[in-house]
Regions:
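Basic, glycine/lysine-rich polyanion-binding surfaces/domains
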Residues: 1-175
Length: 175
């Protein structure tokens, strides 16, 4: 266990187990504002904003990292929830000028532990994520999901997976 902690001092990890949806269109900000628990209008371009997506009884379906990319928004979450989330969000688009696009295979997500990058979105003081074109990766990245998950859990940040989806309310996640 001590060796894992030492290895976490600085690290870049390819986050292959996370899905990425792009939300765009003239009504994207208002659409997300009406769907999630946090104030999307206060989203800082260089930071990750945490948001819960709840069903009608108030139970959390998913927990997102929301980021801005130009005028668009990116939602990052465990890939096992992709189909469920994408389909559910599309139900609520109705007449809004909103496009929901799965960009998981187009853009890559790199987790940074105690490192920085000019293109980063900060999660907290220790963790950040970089979103870039999947073809543009020039650095060999570790695929050590256990190291990332340990650092993420050590930061006391929640995560929702299929097994916990629609089981908890935001207060149980300290949101």
């Amino acid at each position: 266990e001590e060796k894992i902690i030492d290895a976490l001092k600085t690290m870049k990890i390819l986050l292959k187990n996370r899905a990425l949806l792009k939300i765009s269109g003239n009504d994207a900000e208002e659409f997300l504002q009406n769907q999630f628990t946090n104030d999307i209008k206060k989203l800082d371009r260089k930071k990750v904003q945490f948001n819960a997506y709840c069903q009608h009884q108030g139970k959390v379906i998913a927990f997102f990292w929301v980021m801005r990319m130009g005028e668009d928004f990116l939602l990052s979450f465990p890939d096992e929830l992709l189909e469920k989330i994408e389909n559910r969000l599309k139900i609520f688009v109705i007449m809004s000028d909103v496009i929901i696009e799965n960009v998981t295979n187009v853009l890559s997500q790199t987790g940074l532990i105690n490192e920085s990058s000019p293109n980063e979105c900060r999660i907290n003081d220790e963790l950040a994520v970089v979103i870039e074109d999947s073809n543009g990766q020039s650095v060999e990245l570790a695929e050590n999901h256990i190291a990332w998950e340990k650092a993420y859990l050590d930061s006391h940040l929640p995560e929702i997976y299929n097994v916990t989806s629609e089981k908890l309310v935001p207060q149980m996640l300290n949101l």
